[in-house]
């Protein structure tokens, strides 16, 4: 399925976004989003899609990942200064909806040890799941830093009740090539999720947190 966004248009938009952020330096790292408008789609009737794709470059380096770990994982997390909670700490939340909601808000994503992942519904109730942040599995065979980077590089497309959505695909300190590759990957993946592919795409824009939104499509 070929992309309807030409390489030239892609780079024009990427450069416009990066240039705008250089001209007006903010005192925080601006995130770059892909904003998507859909058409010929009825959120009531049509199946709401959701899917995740791993990008080549981490879009949000400051993303906070918390490890819900067994003893070994918690020790490892502490040595890496990664936020971490053990089963005891989770029990203390006592399934309190407010506290679980607060936890879900505090972190962008969670990873959990095998022994803990099965206990999460029992320990925390459905709160993390409702927030769309049910933990990914962290095994002892893989490197924690690699796994965290993988989580940070993964973006999620989720169709809700409205016909527009936006996802973080990068930040303004990326090179044009890095940002362009992430945007290209994101668009192709999104289009593959749509029932009628490009016929469901009304518009695509790119936008940094504070910048103008050049039109990709």
From Swiss-Prot:
Molecular function (Gene Ontology), one example: structural constituent of ribosome
InterPro entries hit by this protein: eL8/uL1-like (IPR050257), Ribosomal_uL1 (IPR002143), Ribosomal_uL1-like (IPR023674), Ribosomal_uL1/biogenesis (IPR028364), Ribosomal_uL1_3-a/b-sand (IPR016095)
Keywords: Ribonucleoprotein, Ribosomal protein
GO CC terms, sorted: large ribosomal subunit
Record Gene3D superfamilies: 3.30.190.20, 3.40.50.790
A Pfam entry, by short name: Ribosomal_L1
A biological-process GO annotation: translation
Family according to the record: Belongs to the universal ribosomal protein uL1 family.
Protein name, as recorded: Large ribosomal subunit protein uL1
